[in-house]
Amino acid sequence: MCGSVVSDSEREFEFHFWGFGHLGKEEERIMAGKRSSPFSSPLLRPPPEFLNVKEEGETETPCWRKEVDENLKRLQSLLFGADKFLEKSDFSSAQILGLRLLGFLDSRSVTDADRDFIGPIRREVASKIDLALEGLVSDSDRKAFELANTAPGAIFGSKGGFDVEKIKQSKYFGFHVSQSNGKGVKEMEERHDTDKLIPKAPKSMMQAKLTSLYGNSIGKPDNQRKTSVNNQDRASDECVIVERSHGFGFGTKRPHAETSSLANDGEVKEDGAPNGFVSAKIKLEMDVRQKRGSTESPSSCLSPQSDKNALGRGYGSRSGGLRRGYRSNFVPPVKTNGNNVGNLTSRIGGKTDDALDDSTRTCLEMLCGPDGELPEKLRNLEPRLIEHVSNEIMDRDPNVRWDDIAGLEHAKKCVTEMVIWPLLRPDIFKGCRSPGKGLLLFGPPGTGKTMIGKAIAGEAKATFFYISASSLTSKWIGEGEKLVRALFGVASCRQPAVIFVDEIDSLLSQRKSDGEHESSRRLKTQFLIEMEGFDSGSEQILLIGATNRPQELDEAARRRLTKRLYIPLPSSEARAWIIQNLLKKDGLFTLSDDDMNIICNLTEGYSGSDMKNLVKDATMGPLREALKRGIDITNLTKDDMRLVTLQDFKDALQEVRPSVSQNELGIYENWNNQFGSLSL
């Protein structure tokens, strides 16, 4: 910079612009790069970083171009930042940068020549501030000015005179007015000189912050240069007029512009955050409530402790009730009134009410008690786990009743005693008559165990959880146990509840010392603990498990499942009922009793699922025969197909074979004789 060549006109402009025009002959020695005596004016004394202190205590002035370059950089940065924020419609930040630039220009206006050179730039900056203030005017105020046919200006105006003494005696302005009286220009210059000697942050940091405007981030203003309307003593008359418009304070980091009437303006100053300060978290909560049409006031987000300490709070201090770290689980000691769902959800997993989805929030609201508090079992669980378990609730009627199940009279009677009757008459089924809390349905596959669970969901007016192994397992270590806790916690909140676990042997198989993963063992242990814990006598929760491998169940799980019902293969009468019921639904039943007896004898050892597949294959016989006659399937009608006959079932028996072996039936019968609940 020192070696560059400039013209005389440029040199004269730079000296007059930055306050060097009053030095006289001294400037020639400075421009020539020679040593000179220290600056005569305290306002033009360079910062400490530009002074080279020698051992003898003498000081050497730096190259004047460096200081000019720093001033130009600051001017361009602030001016560019204000223009950039105006383009982005960020009027609040543009206003702050414009005011900082205005103060910077005023600090360099020492002589009349300086004011003449700086005047055009100052008027341009003032116009940018006016544009920012017009952008900050709320829609309601703008409409009011349009109706009054008046240009937007100061909200508080007075056509007549005002009493200065009354203002001095005011609670808010008396102190500042009394302090400002008697202060001359000399005192202000001395104070400015003192401020110049205070070490400040390097200007490179401010330049780095302002360069972030090329992206989406916004540079934060310097805290040492922020001043409010009340304590700004050195502002010019034009600055006072600008700051008075619409009551926006300039001592805020990011002032929150909200629509407020003149009547409640005082209430906002007293109850809201002091000096208009709004933290990022509270600002986000206010925006979310405004989008959802909430009528809760922004001041309710702050706890009483934070309101009490807000007056002495700086930018580096922390207020009570706010999170102190990333995903912190800090619980504020003060309990707020009103809707407690958001406060409770903030305790779960460190998430606030704004971080939850609508489905998760709805799920938590359904589980809250009359006081708006979550039960003790669910407070330490993450909301997503609670929602995951709640999604397993069967909210649709499976349209299965006891009449749709063939045979199994003993199983129907036991389930009615354990589920249906206690729900209808809880006053009778208590004490010694209280039903068991565990039911096991075991038997060969395809015999109707899952169908019994669906019938329970249709007959019992209770919350029905349809659980499988995938519902309680996760790839994350420790999450399976939390899902088990969430399952029984939600069931306790939604009681009367029925938990149906299909293929329960996959979850509660026998625990082994070798060859078993640690996470699987912890999951079984947690499940057994919850099964033992919810059996308190007063809770209406029933656990039903269905399995094809009862011999692989853990002994502790077998003890907790007090009723163990064997679901055998359907009898001859049950098989005939299945055939008749399925064919009558489609209007295809024309078989005689002799044909039914023959079919039942030929289907010995078939399960209920095998019988259903047999009927489906038999009904395909008339269709295959019609297609063999050359009828196009696109033109085929029901009249072209004959009814189902015995021969169709005999042909289907060649395609559909029984799925259960006789050896497996022996295992089920032996286990039933040893551990099952036998029929009377």
Curated annotation (Swiss-Prot):
Compositionally biased region (Polar residues): 295-308, 336-346
Enzyme type, top EC level: hydrolase
CC annotations in GO: nucleus
Keyword entries, A-Z: ATP-binding, DNA damage, DNA recombination, DNA repair, Hydrolase, Nucleotide-binding, Nucleus
Localisation: Nucleus
Presence of keyword DNA damage: yes
Family, per entry: Belongs to the AAA ATPase family.
Name under which the protein is recorded: ATPase family AAA domain-containing protein FIGL1
